[in-house]
Amino acid sequence: MERGNRKSRIGVVVSNKMAKTVVVKVERRVADPKYGKIVKRAEKYKAHDENNACQIGDKVRIVETRPMSKDKRWRIAETLEKAEV
């Protein structure tokens, strides 16, 4: 069940060492304000992974959700691509 317009991001899992939590790195491209060159910026989000299904390197979609802990405000919506083993 979808609850209104929630933000979503696509990123890569960089850590899965915590219980039911993964760290997802989301890269975006922005233009430098002065010179206009396109540069990559990255942000890391802690996301809830109920089944501990994600592995490092998986490409996932995360969506906003209620606060689950001090840092965790996102959850895994779907796994888009599994990592090569």
Curated annotation (Swiss-Prot):
Q: Which domain of life is it from?
A: Bacteria
A single GO molecular-function term is:
structural constituent of ribosome
Q: Could you confirm whether the keyword RNA-binding appears in this record?
A: yes
**Which Gene Ontology BP terms does the record give?**
translation
UniProt-listed InterPro entries: NA-bd_OB-fold, Ribosomal_uS17, Ribosomal_uS17_bact/chlr
* Alphabetized UniProt keyword annotations: Ribonucleoprotein, Ribosomal protein, RNA-binding, rRNA-binding
Could you give one GO CC term from the UniProt record?
cytosolic small ribosomal subunit
* Covalent S-S links between cysteines: none
* Pfam families, per the entry: Ribosomal_S17
The record's function comment reads: One of the primary rRNA binding proteins, it binds specifically to the 5'-end of 16S ribosomal RNA.
Describe the subunit structure: Part of the 30S ribosomal subunit.
Family designation: Belongs to the universal ribosomal protein uS17 family.
Entry's HAMAP family? Ribosomal_uS17_B (MF_01345_B)
Q: What is this protein called?
A: Small ribosomal subunit protein uS17
Question: Corresponding gene?
Answer: rpsQ
